[in-house]
């Protein structure tokens, strides 16, 4: 379930006019921007951008970028983008800066449905005139490259059939590789990057039943270099995205100084999807409501915007 | 240019009725089947199958399969399929039988446009409840697997921009790998499987200008194990599909006993696309018209059907 609160009825033209006043008037009216954009779903934001473009011959993103600043600007800008295009931007920034590249690429590859991942690949090409795998492969090396490129180019079967025999044999293959510390074993990459999510779930369950320990825990027990961490992230994203995002939020908030990039990423990308469920998991694990934790670690317009996306009533 | 001759006006229902008579009457009327299906394009065949299904509650493919036989049956059956579905069948047969797997997978991966390749991947999933990369990865190993999976999962940028600097540096990378006989070098696979076709063309041209020999010739000069052959095929398919298909036809016909599978594959898959151009290349290289060579090597209904697809007037 989503946290975003958006009105069933809205007028794109009125919103565009109100936003124009907010960015072009005497001083920027951040509150108005938050109260409009923070309450519009992807389809509505798209209509608002189109209306704004038609009225003022300018992309709404331009004044948002120039009039706002810092984490608030980044959050509003990313939120306003079309979701697939936003993921393309996130992927490109991660690849170019080589920061968080594993996490961002793995999230996009392993959490999205096959069709959603494809939409991101399309959006990436439209925006950057390259394929995402092309840029990713050119900016990474070795085993990590093999894993990430295989994951991002996957177009998994999306059906719900389970082949129990296969789950059995591939749970063994995974365990043998982990036992032998052959983490970069081609078979691990093959299985994680080609099997359907339903099939993988069955394989991971079989692994846990056979070994008495989950594959993700087993992986980390054996130490954790970058490649193992990436594998671990992929398995978590494939297996239980909500639990995974809870952990990302927890780490982002716990860190001295707060990891705003991760915080913004999770809230902006999940607000229209499953942020309500992630909030629940967060509360169970931390005994503190997510809103409260976010409010404590952030401030000003950035805080107000994140809390709005988190479903706070105005 | 295509060789297929199909009427602008046709009636799917009439065709379906005529085909019904041809397969269900006293003795099968192969000539009628050839004269109808051999003159209908993909859209028309689709309509005929739909009309047949509606009239007789049966897929037209069923009687075609049961009433026809041998190479003729295979050719008519594959021709009647929707093109993306046909490629899915070709890929699956190649993967399962491990025959011609390199050629078929590389053709589909490197000759199709990114969207066409995607359509084949979708058709494959619909038909087999697996992804093509999943089956391919499970049935191959080692370097060949790396290459084929990377090619079949590609969703290349389809634009026409060329980055000359990149072509320069990647021509060098390719040459260094070939010079060192490091054919399985990850960089070769990365470049071939991620760069756009336009960019690759520029890279191959730069290679030829720098080295005085084309990359495909250079590859074969260094000996030819299976992996090198697969690389060679991929480069030819990316670079000049018509020349590549001419060679496939030449080899299929020259072989003692004729390679009907390859012959059928090229004619059936290219008749609505560029078979006229391939015929021209064939004539230039062999001084014998392709129709004549095919007629000499085949017989009966199979021969009549292939010649019809090759554009022979009735």
Curated annotation (Swiss-Prot), chains A, B:
PROSITE patterns, A to Z: ANNEXIN_1, ANNEXIN_2
Tissue specificity comment: Predominantly in developing fruit.
MF terms in GO: calcium ion binding; calcium-dependent phospholipid binding; phosphatidylserine binding
Protein's organism: Fragaria ananassa (Strawberry)
Source taxon at top rank: Eukaryota
Keywords from the UniProt entry: Annexin, Calcium, Calcium/phospholipid-binding, Metal-binding, Repeat
Residue numbers binding Ca(2+) 3: 298
Chain residues that bind Ca(2+) 1: 25, 27, 67
Name of the protein this chain belongs to: Annexin-like protein RJ4
Positions contributing to Ca(2+) 2 binding: 253, 255, 257, 297
SMART domains: ANX
InterPro entries from the UniProt entry: Annexin (IPR001464), Annexin_repeat (IPR018502), Annexin_repeat_CS (IPR018252), Annexin_sf (IPR037104), AnnexinD_plant (IPR009118)
Cellular component terms per the entry's GO annotation: cytoplasm; plasma membrane
Entry-linked SUPFAM superfamilies: Annexin
Gene Ontology biological process terms from the UniProt entry: response to cold; response to heat; response to salt stress; response to water deprivation
